[in-house]
A protein has these predicted regions:
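Short juxta-domain linker segments that transition from a proline/glycine-rich
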Residues: 1-175
Length: 175
């Protein structure tokens, strides 16, 4: 449902882009329902970190620990997400001003990414959406404190992609 999807930047997004994105969500659900009936996909392995909303860096560290990632860089984020049961799909070309969005449907997490961005931007967008899945999935998008939720997701994404321990270890060798 549209009310369950929260878009990051509504300023640049046209109504047509919003509608195309929501249509992609509907098609993505149908696609994965078909796949789920025929194949044994990984079950979602996400933990509810909503209690750590005010400490996104802690939430990122807890999820990395839960997934056994340690503090080293992650090689292939999309492969990791899919292995952890997240249904990852691409947005179409007619959604240029939509960065990404995510939602839960029937106990399955979905993530839609704009592949017209740089790899670095796509990685950040995907980690940002991961934050929404683990920090905000109990919050109705219509009533969520959007600005706070976006800041929390940005902080989570930064900490998830570049853990403090790894950065400090690398910087220590530089200086």
């Amino acid at each position: 449902e549209a009310r369950e999807v929260s878009f990051r930047s509504l300023k640049k997004m046209s109504a047509a882009e919003r509608n195309a994105s929501l249509a992609a969500g509907t098609l993505g659900i149908s696609f994965y329902e078909w796949i789920d009936e025929r194949f044994n996909l990984p079950q979602p392995d996400l933990i509810d970190l909503s209690k750590e909303r005010e400490r996104p860096d802690v939430a990122a560290r807890l999820l990395r620990q839960h997934w056994g990632l340690g503090d080293r860089p992650i090689g292939n984020l999309l492969k990791l997400y899919e292995a952890k049961g997240i249904r990852v799909l691409s947005l179409s070309e007619n959604t240029r001003n939509v960065d990404a969005y995510s939602f839960w449907h029937s106990d399955s997490p979905y993530m839609f990414l704009n592949q017209q961005k740089t790899a670095e931007r796509s990685n950040f967008d995907s980690a940002h959406e991961l934050a929404h899945l683990v920090l905000h999935f109990h919050v109705d998008a219509a009533t969520a404190p959007t600005e706070d939720a976006e800041k929390q997701a940005d902080q989570f994404a930064s900490a998830f992609l570049m853990p403090e321990a790894d950065i400090k270890g690398r910087i220590g060798h530089v200086y």
